[in-house]
Each structure stands twice: as structure tokens, then as C-alpha cells.
Design a protein with these regions (language model features):
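Extended, low-hydrophobicity, polar/charged segments
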Residues: 1-186
């Protein structure tokens, strides 16, 4: 996979999609300093490993989940190397068993395709249909990294800016969850 070894600290003159440019301009408007990396499409966390070396930060795994009736939707942010077991999450948020939302639902609700889901896509959730869940270990790293609504670029910024600038600007409250597996299940 191609990853440009040069990083940038501002938006490019031109992007392939409007939503990518909106992501950069949103971060700049709210005073978030970021590092931007360009690369081939990285739709899985495994493909992001090369990008992580260039930006020197772990990329967050973003999952769009829904209840069985598909009436409640959740965006879950977890460390990229963490396994996700739905039973631990369902119990913590008092929900029936959760499943992955479809790509079609992702497009409709957040204007992104599978592999491009990001906390920044919440800017397209004007009706606030998505409940944000953040695994506690996401806050342990100094930096937070995610795609800018397309999976051919990645941005890295301070995790404190996620909490103190990004989420308030998105008008988002969130629930912290603990998804570490008990030792007997590892």
C-alpha cells in the first residue's frame, strides 16, 4: 500500500470529495492543529498500520452499530488493536444484542461509505440520530487519529482536542465504555 512519507499540517488546495475538505475546514475553524497524511485507500485497520508508522499514532477503529430493530444507532470508537465483543457493550448501554449497521445506513445517516467512518462524520448527523460511545482506552494515547470522511487520508491531532474541541463543536455528548475482555476470555 502506498503511503506518502511527507505529512502536512493544513488542508490541500483540492480534495477528491467535498466531505473531505469539510473535515479539514471544520478542524481548522475550531482551532485544532492536525497532521495530515495521504495514502491509498485504507478501509481496514490492518491496512492502516503503514499509515500509523508515518504519523506516529494509532488509528482509531470506528464501528456503526444498531439494535435488532434498527431503531437506535451507535458509533463506537475503540483502539484499533482491540477486539470487539458485542455482549460486553450491549450490557453497558442497556441494549439488546447489537449488530453492524449496513453500508447503506452508514451512507444515509453519516454521508460516508464503509471504511471511511470517523468521528468527524458526525457533522453530517444533523438530527443527532447516532449515539457516540468511546472505549475508555481511546483517551489513554496522547494523539487521536482518524480518516477525514474518506479512507485515502488520515488526520492526527491531540486526544485532548477530541474531548475539548471536536466533540463540543459537534454538540456531542458521549458515553465511555469498557470493552476489555476478562482475563479468562482472552
Amino acid at each position: 500500500m502506498y503511503v506518502n512519507k511527507q505529512t502536512f499540517n493544513s488542508h490541500p488546495e483540492k480534495t477528491n470529495t467535498e466531505k473531505e475538505m469539510q473535515s479539514y475546514l471544520f478542524l481548522e475553524k475550531i482551532g485544532v492543529d492536525y497532521i495530515r497524511a495521504e495514502h491509498d485507500e485504507a478501509a481496514t485497520i490492518e491496512l492502516c498500520e503503514e499509515v500509523e508508522k508515518v504519523i506516529d499514532a494509532k488509528i482509531c477503529k470506528n464501528l456503526l452499530l444498531c439494535n435488532r430493530q434498527q431503531t437506535k444507532f451507535y458509533m463506537l470508537l475503540i483502539p484499533g488493536d482491540m477486539l470487539f465483543k458485542t455482549k460486553y457493550l450491549s450490557a453497558q448501554i442497556n441494549s439488546s444484542r447489537l449488530s453492524f449497521a449496513s453500508g447503506e445506513q452508514m451512507e444515509k445517516l453519516l454521508n460516508v461509505s464503509p471504511g471511511s467512518l470517523t468521528v468527524l462524520s458526525l457533522m453530517f448527523d444533523k438530527e443527532e440520530n447516532i449515539e457516540l460511545l468511546i472505549e475508555k482506552n481511546v483517551f489513554k494515547d496522547e494523539y487521536f487519529a482518524c480518516h477525514p470522511c474518506v479512507n485515502s487520508a488520515t488526520v492526527k491531532f491531540l486526544t485532548s482536542d477530541l474531548k475539548d474541541k471536536v466533540l463540543p463543536a459537534l454538540n456531542r455528548k458521549y458515553t465511555v465504555v469498557d470493552l476489555e475482555c476478562p482475563d479468562d476470555e482472552v
